[in-house]
Amino acid sequence: STAANANVIFKGSGWGHGVGLSQYGAKAMGLDGASYEQILKRYFTNIGITGLNETESSSFIITDETPLSVGILQNSSTVLFIVQSGKAQLCFDQSNFCVGTANPGETFRFGAEEIGKCAFLRVNGDKSVTKIGTSGNCSASVIPTSVKTEIFIPYKARSYKSGILRFRERSDSVRINTVYELGVEDYLKGLSEVPDSWPLASIQAQVIVSRSYAVWKALQRGEE
């Protein structure tokens, strides 16, 4: 009889896309003593691992403090937000003019008053609203004044910090897209791809892959 082949190959991707790093494969390699370089080179062939400062030194990825944009809401008529801690400036980007300051615990609504004109409205305790300053172009921002500033978006039931909340009018309507701009390292703090109890090398490999993917997508999109 013919001896069985000693090598067995399994193919599959579980519920994922099957491309790139396998988290559980990285965990197994980490438990087996592999370094993060060895883990990465197992899943990505012909690669080098280089710092961003060396490969993108003149790119907006390095020169812009908040080069990454994370979509929060699309095609909404208004956006409700609450300043949970710290303070933030309410600004219109086209005129580079800030109409007021949002204080801790205050609730605001941003939306269109007419075609091409939007306003910040403070929502009072009795549900009435107070317009903050004058109206402006619908490209606007909520800019934190300190590292403690945290902004809550009720529709998403999530809080955001270490970045800038941006509103952008859609080109095809008076409705608004909302994004959160932040730095590469601050973006990585929000990831939870693998538990922190996993081997350090496995976590390091995941961080490098996540950083590389985020930067690649940002470079594809280009600077705003």
Language-model features, listed with the residues they occupy:
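Conserved, single-site charged/polar hotspot
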Residues: 1-224
